[in-house]
Amino acid sequence: VDAEKMSITINPPASPPCYAGEFADQYGAARPLDIICLGRAAVDFYGDQIGSRLEDMSSFAKYLGGSSCNIAYGCARLGLKSAMLTRVGDEHMGRFVREELQRAGVDTSHVITDKERLTGLVILGIKDQQTFPLIFYRRDCADMAVSTEDFDADFIASARALLITGTHFSTENTYRTSMQAIEYAKAAGTKVVVDIDYRPVLWGLTSLGDGETRFISSSGVSAHLQTVLPHCDLIAGTEEEIHIAGGSTDTISALRKVRELTGATIVLKLGPLGCTVLHAEIPKRMDDLIVHQGVRVDVLNVLGAGDAFMAGFLRGWLRDEDDQTCTAYANASGALVVSRHGCAPAIPSEEE
C-alpha cells in the first residue's frame, strides 16, 4: 500500500433499506449479539526468554492474536455476546484461532476458512519495559481477504455494535469490506466502533521488519481514516493514534479535527495515566481533560494492553454504564494484561 497515494472512493452509507430496519425492529433491544468484531486474526509467538533480543530467543509460547480477535475474546471473557468476522487459513494455525475463540464463547460462524491464504503470524519479544520487538508475517494473509461476500445485512443487524480495527481500512479490499459492514450497521441501528490500532508497517510506511514502530506521520493515512470517522459512534486510540486520525502531532489539535468530523464519543488512552472520555466539545488544554486514573502494576508486557482496555470499556458501554464504570473496567483490564506474558489469554474474566 502506498498510503500517500491512496485513493479509494466508497459511496457513503445509504438510507436504511427496509429489510435491515425490519430486522432491527424484530430483535429490538434483545439482539442475539452484543458486538461483532471485524479485523485481524493471527497467532502470536511470544519469546520465553524475557530480556533477550529476538535473535537470541530459543523457545516461544503460542497465543491467539490480532487486535480484533483479542477484543472479541476479551468481550466474551467479560460477559458479552461477541462474534468474530474474519478469515483464517485452511491449516493448523487457522484451526487454532477458531478453536481458541470458541473456547472463550465467541461466535465463529463468520470466521471463514480461506483455502488460498495462510493465517497471519506475529513473532514478539520482551526485551525490557520500553522495548518490545515484533515482526508481522501478514503479506496476503487470510484476514486481509475478508470480503463483502462473507456476511450479509442480517448478520450485522443481529448485533448491537460493530467494531472494526484500523488495519482493515488500509487496503482497497478491506476498506470496501469494512465500509459495507458500516453501511449495514447504520441502516440497522447497530453502533459503529473504531479502534484506530495504528501500525505504520501495516500501512506500508516502514520496512517489513520494523513492526515495533508505533507512529509515522502520513497525510495520506490521516485523510483516508478521516473518511471513516463521520460514520462512528465510538472512537478509541492512544495519543499517537489520535494524532494520525486528526492529522496533527498536537493532541488537542488532532482531537478538534476528529470532533469536526464526528459527534462520536472519543476515548483517549493515556497509558499508565489512565484515559479520558470526550462526548462533546474538546477543551483548550490537555490539563483541562478529566482523566480517569489507571491502575498501578509492575509492567511486563505492554503489547495487547489496548485490546484488553477496549474489551473492558465495551463491557460497560454496551450496558449503558457511566464513564466512571466503563473506564474502571477498561483500565483494570489493561493493567492486568501488561503484568502478564501474552495478550488474549491474559485478558481477565469479569470475576477477576
Regions found by a protein language model. Name each.
Residues 75, 238, 306:
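Short, conserved phosphate/pyrophosphate- and ester-handling motifs at nucleotide-, phospho-/glycolipid
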Residues 51-58, 208-212, 290-293:
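Short glycine/proline- and charge-enriched loop/turn segments
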Residues 82, 108, 192-194, 266:
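Hydrophobic beta-strand scaffold residues
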Residues 2-107, 130, 146, 298-300:
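Glycine-rich phosphate/adenosyl-contacting loop at the front of the ribokinase-like
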Residues 2-36, 183-187, 247-352:
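Conserved phosphate-binding/catalytic region of the ribokinase-like
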Residues 30, 155-157, 228-229:
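A short, aliphatic-rich alpha-helical micro-motif
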Residues 161, 167-257, 264, 273-275, ...:
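Conserved beta-alpha-beta core of the PfkB/ribokinase-like small-molecule kinase fold
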